[in-house]
Amino acid sequence: MSLEDLKSKDVDALRAELLELRQTQMKLRLQKASGQLQQTHQIRNVRRDIARIKTLLTQKKVRV
């Protein structure tokens, strides 16, 4: 997910994306705990995407 794509979204779309990524993160954690996850780097990528979205939400809140 690119930063430019995220910047073009409004606050509601970012919140929806954040919710979706948190659900994905939970699924990946459960898969890792049960030993089913082969590509563990996905957890890190999702965590970083969540951080990007939270940063953008904070920036947009400050501007308003």
Curated annotation (Swiss-Prot):
One of its GO terms (molecular function) is structural constituent of ribosome. GO terms for biological process: translation. Transmembrane segments: none annotated. One of its GO terms (cellular component) is cytosolic large ribosomal subunit. Keywords: Ribonucleoprotein, Ribosomal protein. It comes from the Bacteria. The keyword Ribosomal protein applies. The keyword Ribonucleoprotein applies. InterPro entries: Ribosomal_protein_uL29 (IPR050063), Ribosomal_uL29 (IPR001854), Ribosomal_uL29_CS (IPR018254), Ribosomal_uL29_sf (IPR036049). Gene3D superfamilies: 1.10.287.310. PANTHER family: 60S RIBOSOMAL PROTEIN L35/50S RIBOSOMAL PROTEIN L29 (PTHR10916), LARGE RIBOSOMAL SUBUNIT PROTEIN UL29C (PTHR10916:SF0). Belongs to the universal ribosomal protein uL29 family. This is Large ribosomal subunit protein uL29. It comes from Dichelobacter nodosus (strain VCS1703A).
